[in-house]
A protein has these predicted regions:
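S-adenosylmethionine/decaboxylated-SAM
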Residues: 1-205
């Protein structure tokens, strides 16, 4: 689990799935006391390993932790609920998707957040243009960034180009499920290699 915040998802997976092993990583370096208390009560076999202060895009630390916890075993699932930013999320995908077993699932949460924020801002602008303009001026320059949803669009194209790598992409508002195919994928394979030349030209990567 990448990005555990207050640990609600970790607790849910622990109770529902009773995993043989579960690794959670979180950017914040401050442990969540309520999660620690929950694990002390419900994880007597110490199957859950939470590591704090880990950046999801750390291409050295993240693979090291996965290897430490799971060894050479394939993963059943990965849940990315961390930064919700394009760059770090691509880095995580490139590291962890190849580690999934055949038919394993990669879950990306809150991919549509940028668009929901945009809609809300446009509704506010329409209802009171002068007030909206003042608040934008106070806020300063808007930082342009690649929307998180770009990753979802690229994965859909990747499934068309390489169905033996990604046989299924299921998208709903706020959540995306990506299934692992039968073909081997080298660890750290860049996302552009999933796309093929046509896909690369579509996204200018």
């Amino acid at each position: 689990e990448v990005g555990i915040d207050q640990g609600g998802g970790t607790a849910y997976f622990t109770k529902l799935l009773r995993p043989k092993a579960l690794l959670g990583i979180e950017l914040s370096s401050e442990p969540v006391c309520s999660l620690q208390s929950f694990l002390e009560e419900h994880d007597k076999k110490k199957c859950v390993d939470v590591r704090w202060g880990v950046d999801q895009s750390d291409t050295q630390k993240v693979p090291e932790l996965v290897q430490e916890v799971f060894g050479d075993e394939y993963l059943d699932a990965v849940v990315d609920d961390a930064s919700h930013l394009y760059g770090p999320s691509v880095a995580t995908f490139e590291m962890l998707f190849p580690r999934l077993r055949q038919a394993g699932v990669y879950i990306i949460e809150d991919w549509s957040a940028d668009h929901l924020i945009e809609r809300r801002l446009m509704e506010e602008a329409a209802s009171d243009p002068e007030d909206f303009a003042r608040r934008v001026a106070v806020a300063g320059d808007v930082v342009q960034k690649t929307p998180f949803s770009m990753l979802i669009a690229q994965l859909v194209v990747a499934s068309a180009r390489n169905p033996d790598w990604i046989p299924l992409v299921r998208v709903a508002r706020g959540i995306c499920e990506v299934r692992r195919g039968i073909a081997p994928i080298a660890s750290g394979t860049p996302l552009r290699d999933y796309l093929g030349e046509l896909g690369q030209s579509m996204f200018n990567v």
